[in-house]
Amino acid sequence: MSVTRDDVRHVAQLARLDFSEEEEARMAEELSEILGYVEKLDELDTAGVPPMSHVLDVTNVFRSDEIEERIDRGQALEPAPDADNEHFLVPQVVE
């Protein structure tokens, strides 16, 4: 598949990016090479390869949940610079 500078311009516009003409030309060439490689992958015979969600055989490495003693809300809020009885209070950052 060949990527044109118009294709690059269109995608750049969607992503709100601005490229020079040299950058557009370089990206069109590089993307064409990448898509050419992907097309080569389509030629591979994968009939005997089982579907997988991960390249490596990964198992669950998470620990099991254990109930632990926890601090109460008052202790958690105590070091906060500003809090009410239930919440941390922070300055407004978005108007």
Swiss-Prot record:
InterPro entries: Asp/Glu-ADT_sf_sub_c (IPR036113), GatC (IPR003837). GO terms for biological process: glutaminyl-tRNAGln biosynthesis via transamidation; regulation of translational fidelity; translation. Its EC number is 6.3.5.-. Pfam families: GatC (PF02686). The keyword Ligase applies. Residues 74-95 are annotated as: Disordered. One of its GO terms (molecular function) is glutaminyl-tRNA synthase (glutamine-hydrolyzing) activity. SUPFAM superfamilies: Glu-tRNAGln amidotransferase C subunit (SSF141000). It catalyses: L-glutamyl-tRNA(Gln) + L-glutamine + ATP + H2O = L-glutaminyl-tRNA(Gln) + L-glutamate + ADP + phosphate + H(+); L-aspartyl-tRNA(Asn) + L-glutamine + ATP + H2O = L-asparaginyl-tRNA(Asn) + L-glutamate + ADP + phosphate + 2 H(+). It comes from the Bacteria. Keywords: ATP-binding, Ligase, Nucleotide-binding, Protein biosynthesis. The keyword Iron does not apply. Heterotrimer of A, B and C subunits. HAMAP family: GatC. Allows the formation of correctly charged Asn-tRNA(Asn) or Gln-tRNA(Gln) through the transamidation of misacylated Asp-tRNA(Asn) or Glu-tRNA(Gln) in organisms which lack either or both of asparaginyl-tRNA or glutaminyl-tRNA synthetases. The reaction takes place in the presence of glutamine and ATP through an activated phospho-Asp-tRNA(Asn) or phospho-Glu-tRNA(Gln). Belongs to the GatC family. This is Aspartyl/glutamyl-tRNA(Asn/Gln) amidotransferase subunit C.
